[in-house]
Structures are given as structure tokens and as C-alpha cells.
């Protein structure tokens, strides 16, 4: 307090204050003497506080310096970069190769996971701690980036489940300069939008893998910023190599689990891929998963789920379909920004009743279907697309008015034809025109195909 404030108080109040501050011999003092004594005590206390603050500042500086020297001392100099897998016990590991456990995995502590709100599927970068003799894995010292963003920015994201799904309304163009007839047909007959849940239904040897590869290359050209995840389950090793070499880029990841791997391996890989896609969508990015095939993934789950006591025809346990349906059902367009597009292949006419049951279970869940026809394939007509049966739900949100009119004319004309005749006629039209725009104008002008 200042002298003026003390002087404004009555003597009795001043004496009470002095007693509260444990000052001795104040009862016989005059008011002016008491005020002088109070001011002297104030000055002493201020000096003590200043000295204490200075000591605390020195201590904090020493702590910071010690922490910096500790980090420098503990820092191994190696930067960890990979996908995080959070285990049931709360800790996690940064996986590097093909999203699976390996010797070079990096341990992430539960405290770091809680502090930054980390989830399975996050891509982390950060320096590792010096490995001691008894440690099997290196440990993450500090987090530099989460999914390419600073930790403070990455923590602001919403949960995938809290985002609002809407119908796909932004088209992914598959037709590019020099694109194949298959891509032109697909772009017109069954267009794909951002957030589409599409299925390519195919008998064996009908060209489904080639079609997926063409889709991936077209998406790379038309949507260079879209993150492309190609998941190959139960495929041949040579096909994995072929796709890896054909499709590469900064936003492309080819994840595989070949037919010689265990079903648990298939399950783990697929769960890591869908977690990775969800984390990207939470940050408002557009992601596309090309899955080959959902039938083989369902077969793998059928072997590892605990028996439910019920069996569908073909020996399929209904409980085995929950996880593949959760995978396929994650595809959606988000109102808040970002989208997850899934294009999966389903096998039919393989001679296995189980494969047909899996297809029947997934039949109504997608919002786009492309049917490949065995008869066309036997006649060596490629692409072997059954055009009358293929299509997209709510295609009016993706096609313009002219394209809608042309498709209406084409479908009405094909109604009475056999599938082979319809495809032959259409293939002739596609070969005579250089682009889909030209084909649309020609169909509208002629009013028939």
C-alpha cells in the first residue's frame, strides 16, 4: 500500500493490520510512526519476493537447459517415419514396411498417444531415443509431425464417425486424353463420384484387375491430389509387382497380402488400410481405396472369426461379414470436407457357393455397380462390361443434362437387345468417336444407337 492509503485508514484499523502482520510494540506508537513502520515492512517483503522470483527464473532456465542437453544426449539422430498402430494396452508402434510388424519398428509411449490424441493409421515423424542394450525396439523421443501437420494443428481434427455422410456430388473423371474404351464406358455408364461405394462384379479372367489398374492410372491423371490406396488381398505375387511398377507416385500406396499369407495377415493389413484412410479423411483429404477383392477378404474373416453357431449356404458364417461390411461401408462423401471412395471387386461364377453368397450379401450395400460378363469374355470382347446391368445410384448428381439424355436414349435402345449385341453396337460407337462429348452429341442427334 502507498502512504496515502495508510493515512486514509483510522488508527484502530492500522493497529489491527499491524497485529495481523505480526508486528511487535505497535500499541504505544503514534499514527505517523505506525505508517512508517508499515511502509518499511512492505519494502522488506518486496525485496524478498524479488529475490525469490529471480531464483525461480534461474532454476527454470537451468531446467530448460538441462532438458535441452538431455534431449541432445538422448537423441539418436535417426528420424522415424511410418504408420502408427495403437495396441490394446495403450502403447503403439510405428510400422514401416507394408503396414506390418518388423525389426525396425519404433515404440510410442501411452503418454505421447494420450497427449497428442494419436490413433491407429496416423503417419508420424519424429526423432528416436538412443537404444539401450536391453531394449528390443527404438523409442520415439518427440513427435515432429502428425499426417504432415504440426501436432497442435493435427489435434484439432474431428472424429471420422462424427462427420456427416452425403451422396457423392463431385465427379472423378476417368476419361482422359488417350484413355481406353473401358474408361470411357465406365465414365458414362457408371460414373464415379468422390465418396462412391462401388463394386466391380466379375467372373474369373474377365479383366477385373486390369480394369482396376486402368482406374488407378486415370484417377492419378485427373485427380493428382487424391490419395490412392491400392489393397491387394489374396492376389498373386507377380500381379502385386506389376501394379507396384505400373502405378507409382507421392500419393500412391500399394499394400498387399498375397495368397500364401495367413488369413490373420489379410485381416491386419485391411484394418490398417481402412484406419489410414479414415485419418486422412479426418484432415479433409480425398482418399480412394481400390480393393481386390472383397470376396477373398470375406473368406479370410470366415476362417478366423469365432463360430457364431449359424452357417449360411456354402459354409459362410454370418459373423464373418461384419468386418468386411464395416470396411466397405466406410466409403462416404463428407459434408464438412473430405471423402473416402472405395471401389472393390467381387467374384462370381467361380464354382464356389460361398463366393455367390458373399456377393448377394454385398449386393445392395454399394451405390455403384459395374458388371463384367462371362459370355463377352468367352467371345474375347474386351472390355467385357454388361452395360445394361451396370450403373450408378443418383447419377443425376454426377452427369450433366446432355449426358443424362444420351444415357437415357442408349439404355432405352439396349432394352430389347442381347447383352453381346448391345456391347458390340456401343463399342462401334466408341471407336468411331474420339471423346465422350462427341459420342453424347451423336446419340442425341440420332436419337438411337
Predicted regions and their residues:
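Charged, low-complexity terminal tails
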Residues: 1-79, 83-91, 99-104
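N-terminal "pre-motor" subdomain/linker immediately upstream of P-loop NTPase catalytic cores
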Residues: 62-154
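Phosphate-interacting basic helix/loop segments used at nucleotide- and nucleic-acid interfaces
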Residues: 72-80, 181-185, 273-278, 327
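P-loop NTPase nucleotide-binding module
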Residues: 178-235, 274
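P-loop NTP-binding catalytic core
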Residues: 130-200, 206
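P-loop NTPase catalytic core
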Residues: 207, 215-219, 228-250, 254-449
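Short flexible coil/turn linkers enriched for glycine and charged/polar residues
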Residues: 76-78, 86-90, 100-102, 118-122, ...
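Active-site phosphate-binding and catalytic loops of NTP-dependent enzymes
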Residues: 28, 46-48, 70-74, 115, ...
Amino acid at each position: 500500500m502507498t502512504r496515502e492509503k495508510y493515512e486514509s485508514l483510522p488508527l484502530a484499523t492500522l493497529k489491527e493490520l499491524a497485529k495481523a502482520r505480526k508486528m511487535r510494540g505497535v500499541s504505544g506508537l503514534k499514527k505517523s510512526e505506525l505508517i512508517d513502520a508499515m511502509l518499511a515492512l512492505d519494502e522488506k517483503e518486496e525485496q524478498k519476493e524479488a529475490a525469490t522470483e529471480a531464483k525461480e527464473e534461474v532454476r527454470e532456465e537451468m531446467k530448460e537447459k538441462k532438458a535441452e542437453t538431455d534431449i541432445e544426449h538422448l537423441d539418436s539422430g535417426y528420424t522415424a517415419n511410418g504408420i502408427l498402430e495403437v495396441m490394446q494396452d495403450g502403447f503403439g508402434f510405428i510400422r514401416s514396411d507394408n503396414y506390418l510388424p518388423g525389426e525396425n519398428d519404433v515404440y510410442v509411449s501411452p503418454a505421447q498417444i494420450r497427449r497428442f490424441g494419436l490413433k491407429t493409421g496416423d503417419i508420424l515423424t519424429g526423432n528416436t531415443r538412443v537404444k539401450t542394450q536391453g531394449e528390443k525396439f527404438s523409442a520415439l523421443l518427440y513427435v515432429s509431425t502428425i499426417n504432415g501437420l504440426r501436432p497442435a494443428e493435427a489435434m484439432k481434427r474431428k472424429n471420422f464417425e462424427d462427420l456427416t455422410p452425403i451422396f457423392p456430388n463431385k465427379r472423378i473423371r476417368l476419361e482422359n486424353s488417350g484413355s481406353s474404351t473401358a474408361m470411357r464406358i465406365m465414365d458414362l455408364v457408371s460414373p464415379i463420384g468422390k465418396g462412391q461405394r462401388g463394386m466391380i462384379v466379375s467372373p474369373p479372367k474377365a479383366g477385373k484387375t486390369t480394369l482396376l489398374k486402368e482406374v488407378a492410372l486415370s484417377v492419378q491423371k485427373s485427380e493428382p491430389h487424391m490419395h490412392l490406396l491400392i489393397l491387394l488381398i489374396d492376389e498373386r505375387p507377380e500381379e502385386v509387382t506389376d501394379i507396384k511398377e505400373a502405378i507409382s507416385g507421392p500419393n500412391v500406396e500399394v499394400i498387399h497380402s498375397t495368397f500364401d499369407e495367413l488369413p490373420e495377415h489379410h485381416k491386419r493389413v485391411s484394418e490398417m488400410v481402412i484406419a489410414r484412410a479414415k485419418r486422412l479423411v479426418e484432415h479433409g483429404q480425398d482418399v480412394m481405396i481400390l480393393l481386390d477383392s472383397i470376396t477373398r477378404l470375406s473368406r479370410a474373416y470366415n476362417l478366423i472369426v469365432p463360430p457364431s453357431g449359424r452357417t449360411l449356404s456354402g459354409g459362410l458364417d454370418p459373423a464373418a461379414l461384419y468386418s468386411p461390411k464395416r470396411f466397405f461401408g466406410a466409403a462416404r462423401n463428407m459434408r464438412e470436407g473430405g471423402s473416402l471412395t472405395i471401389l472393390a471387386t467381387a467374384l462370381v461364377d467361380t464354382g464356389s457357393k460361398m463366393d455367390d453368397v458373399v456377393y448377394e450379401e454385398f449386393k445392395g450395400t454399394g451405390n455403384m455397380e459395374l458388371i463384367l460378363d462371362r459370355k463377352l469374355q468367352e467371345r474375347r470382347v474386351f472390355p467385357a462390361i454388361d452395360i445394361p446391368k451396370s450403373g450408378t445410384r443418383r447419377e443425376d448428381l454426377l452427369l450433366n443434362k446432355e449426358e443424362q439424355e444420351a444415357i437415357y436414349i442408349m439404355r432405352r435402345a439396349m432394352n430389347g437387345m442381347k447383352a453381346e449385341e448391345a456391347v458390340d453396337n456401343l463399342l462401334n460407337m466408341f471407336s468411331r468417336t474420339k471423346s465422350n462429348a462427341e459420342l453424347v452429341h451423336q446419340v442425341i442427334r440420332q436419337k438411337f444407337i
